[in-house]
Amino acid sequence: MQYRDLRDFLAQLERIGELRRIRVPVSPRLEMTEVCDRLLRAEGPAVVFERPADGAQTYDMPVLANLFGTPRRVALGMGAESLDELRDVGRLLSALKEPEPPRGLREAGKLWTMAKAVWDMAPRKVSSPACQEIVLEGDDVDLSRIPVQTCWPGDAAPLVTWGLVVTRGPHKKRQNLGIYRQQVINRNQVIMRWLAHRGGALDFREHAIAHPGQPFPIAVALGADPATILGAVTPVPDTLSEYQFAGLLRGSRTELAQCLTPSLAQAQLQVPAGAEIVLEGHIQPDPAHPSGYQHALEGPFGDHTGYYNEQDWFPVFTVERITMRRDPIYHSTYTGKPPDEPAVLGVALNEVFVPLLQKQFPEIADFYLPPEGCSYRMALVSMKKQYAGHAKRVMFGVWSFLRQFMYTKFIVVVDDDVDLRDWKEVIWAITTRVDPARDTVMVENTPIDYLDFASPVSGLGSKMGIDATNKWPGETTREWGQPIVMDAAVKSRVDAMWETLFQ
């Protein structure tokens, strides 16, 4: 599906029955979460809440939710028509990440065509962007005008969830795009929860070292087009900007707007020109804090793990200017025990990961991140095993290949006769092909998800690899079991007589 911006995408979804409008009042406090949770579990449509209201408080701004509630809508957002086509996106990324030298004129021509397609999708800056049709400054900056969801009963405050955070480090040629949740703490401030290894946090750290005591500029785009949002969570090669990749997905160049705040413009921060809402501002200095910048205690919030997370200190982003389109739409979601939108995204992005992994490890037959494992904490790999110890090589290869797998706690490797998408098959392989002492690999003191309260230390924990492949000589001295398989001729004869057996 090709589209210009979020509104064009929503119009196309509505035409094919993938979006519904809710015209009765629904509260952004808890009620929207419950509605969307039921819709997502039923594989229902995206929704626009046209009359958000919380008690006596009403909002003029509609709320878009459950946009990525099915794998098909994720695929449509990435310019594909089905989940299967996302493998092609992965093949494109693998070719861009590690292009192979052409072996002849025909392959050279294909390489040139791909390079030209990437070049033609370079983003372009526009002078009168839709995202700046309305500009709020000074006392008019008030986040309470936006119907930000409070998702769960124990949440500390309303939480911005789909904010596309744009930063640039002092020594970086390109901007970083990231999705980080933001706790609203007053009319013009949010807590920016980014983990230490994420691009935004790294840019901030480099800025604090290079320019201590100077405000750090940030822009947050709310209601960006799906391709740009999904580009921010996809393993785009370092040689390609997320905006350029979004153009490839969408089928048209990404249009960008220069931020209006002078320091943000000086930092060359650019946001999607068609974004519904843009927050411009800074993380301000605070000499009293050890980091030299304002921080606040964030959380607790219900998270994609299905639990409330611990509180921790994160930087405070002060919003100094809000720009928006006329009649803006606020894009929101919730996170909770799978399935939720991050889990659905994980299912879709899984198809993108497979060709990337296969390019590096041709022996991998399939790869699956089960959504029940919080989308990334468990990985299943099937492989064409070629030698003793091969499964362990694949385990460590997966852990180290993409940043997205840094927090994967469990990897189970099976032979290619096992269907990874069928838990019955996986459990059968584990229980029949694994000796716990011989086939379990434990790795201690590795980076782990900050939200993983099961780890002994925040951000540092262990990983487990399980080799559930058939064992080769050198791995066992015993005669290995042969799977029971019915004779093909017998199966064929029974197929032919099946309809007559029960007449």
Curated annotation (Swiss-Prot):
Top-level lineage group: Bacteria
Gene3D superfamilies: Single helix bin, UbiD C-terminal domain-like
Needed co-factor(s): prenylated FMN; Mn(2+)
Keyword Acetylation assigned: no
Keywords annotated in UniProt: Cell membrane, Decarboxylase, Flavoprotein, FMN, Lyase, Manganese, Membrane, Metal-binding, Ubiquinone biosynthesis
GO cellular component annotations of the record: cytosol; plasma membrane
GO BP of this protein: ubiquinone biosynthetic process
Major site of localization recorded for this protein: membrane
SUPFAM superfamilies noted in UniProt: FMN-binding split barrel (SSF50475), UbiD C-terminal domain-like (SSF143968)
Residue positions of the active site: D303 (proton donor)
Pathway annotation from the record: Cofactor biosynthesis; ubiquinone biosynthesis
Membrane-protein topology: Peripheral membrane protein
Catalytic reactions of this protein: a 4-hydroxy-3-(all-trans-polyprenyl)benzoate + H(+) = a 2-(all-trans-polyprenyl)phenol + CO2
EC number(s) reported in the record: 4.1.1.98
Binding-site residues, Mn(2+): N176, E242
Ligand binding (prenylated FMN): I179, Y180, R181, R193, W194, L195, R198, G199
NCBIfam families reported for this sequence: PRK10922.1, UbiD family decarboxylase
The family this protein is said to belong to: Belongs to the UbiD family.
Function: Catalyzes the decarboxylation of 3-octaprenyl-4-hydroxy benzoate to 2-octaprenylphenol, an intermediate step in ubiquinone biosynthesis.
Name assigned to this protein: 3-octaprenyl-4-hydroxybenzoate carboxy-lyase
Organism of provenance: Ralstonia nicotianae (strain ATCC BAA-1114 / GMI1000) (Ralstonia solanacearum)
Taxon lineage: Bacteria, Pseudomonadati, Pseudomonadota, Betaproteobacteria, Burkholderiales
